[in-house]
Design a protein with these regions (language model features):
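Active-site catalytic microenvironments in core metabolic enzymes, especially phosphate/sugar-handling
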Residues: 15, 302, 310
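Signature of the N-terminal lobe/flap region of pepsin-like aspartyl proteases
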Residues: 61-184, 325
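Acidic glycine-/aspartate-rich tracts in secreted/extracellular proteins
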Residues: 112-114, 195, 244, 298
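Aspartyl protease catalytic domain
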Residues: 11-78, 122, 156-280
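Stable alpha-helical elements in mature extracytoplasmic
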Residues: 153, 200-204, 298, 302
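Extended C-terminal subregions enriched in glycine
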Residues: 314-325
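Active-site beta-strand/loop microenvironment that shapes enzyme catalytic pockets
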Residues: 94-109, 273, 278-305
Length: 325
């Protein structure tokens, strides 16, 4: 199954486009299971991740997912990781990052971070970059089972053949919990609107447009399932669309709220039968997660239609046997 995500920003003329190969890695769940740590992790970590990440998408007073009502919707937030390479500083220091349309910040681990997660990943050495500018401000970002804290700075960011100057980013100095310990990526590069940012300053793609680095104000994702023939496993194209990777016309949708990439979804059906959202509802497109989330009553309706039952801990071992949504 191939999926193509196209996101349009605003009218712009630039000078280039760049391809970033993406790699798909085993989920955190799979890695913890292989190491025999999954059950302990699920027992010890019960974050209300949905409320933290998506609550602002819903009107005030809308019931959202409650803790323990659907644990898979909480713990599956990193079950599909597609990451690519960037570099920071001069001389360049390389990092693997998740290109995430569900957040707007760029951060990587700092050389001063003392958390276990940082010790297992590449860390930015600000003192080795002759183009680094220390900001002095601090930031905090919540991610499911924990959070990270850090300090802000500015430096040169290179993605493919594109170099963006004076990019604001974060150096994490504290990454508690197991969320990032088994992750194959080092940090996150957010592609959402600036209003979603925890770190002050423009997101990376906004700066690319401001510095006239891209031909078009468009970035597109190609994400493939892992198969013997899926080469590449994925690709991010900054500044354009690869027409060889899809067939038929593109269905362009207007952004209904600038923060997340929020759009109007017409309906949700299970095997052709409408389950909820019959007159349309708001949804967000998020490359940083694989969960389906929404108001409690709608999610309960969806779970009933596919034969799912709530559980506090455990694994979904028979997903392929469930009805298609």
């Amino acid at each position: 199954m191939l999926r193509l995500l196209l996101l349009l920003l605003s009218t712009w003329m630039g000078s280039a486009a760049v391809r970033v190969p993406l790699r798909r890695v085993p989920s955190v769940r799979t890695q913890l299971r292989t190491q025999g740590l999954l059950e302990d992790f699920l027992k010890d970590n019960r974050p209300d991740m949905f409320n933290r990440r998506y609550a602002q998408c819903f009107p005030p007073g809308t019931p959202s997912l409650r803790l323990g009502r659907s644990s898979e919707k909480i713990y599956n937030f990193m079950d599909a990781q597609y990451y690519g390479e960037i570099s920071l500083g001069n001389p360049p220091q390389n990092f693997s990052v998740i290109f995430d349309t569900g957040s707007a910040d760029l951060w990587v681990p700092s050389s001063y971070c003392v958390s276990q997660a940082c010790a297992l990943h590449r860390r930015f050495k600000a003192f080795e970059s002759n183009s680094f500018h220390h900001d002095g401000r601090t930031f905090g970002i919540h991610y499911g089972s924990g959070h990270l804290l850090g300090v802000m700075g500015r430096d040169t960011v290179k993605i493919g053949e594109m170099t963006t100057m004076n990019q604001e980013f974060g150096e994490s100095v504290y990454e508690p919990g197991a969320t990032f310990v088994t992750a194959k990526f080092d940090g996150v590069l957010g592609l959402a609107y600036q209003s979603l940012a925890e770190i002050l300053g423009n997101p990376v793609f906004d700066n690319m447009m401001a510095q006239k680095m891209v031909d078009q104000p468009v970035f597109s994702f190609y994400l493939s399932r892992r198969t013997a023939t899926s080469i590449p496993e994925g690709e991010l194209l900054l500044g354009g669309i690869d027409e060889d990777l899809y067939t038929g016309p593109i269905n362009w949708l207007p952004v209904s709220a600038k923060g997340y990439w929020q759009i109007k979804m017409e309906s949700v059906a299970v095997q052709g039968v409408s389950s909820f959202c019959p007159r349309g509802c708001q949804a967000i497109v998020d490359t940083g997660t694989s969960l389906i989330g929404g108001p409690t009553n709608d999610m309960l309706s969806l779970q009933q239609l596919i034969g799912a039952t709530p559980t506090n801990i455990g694994e979904v071992k028979h997903l392929r046997m469930k009805p298609n949504i």
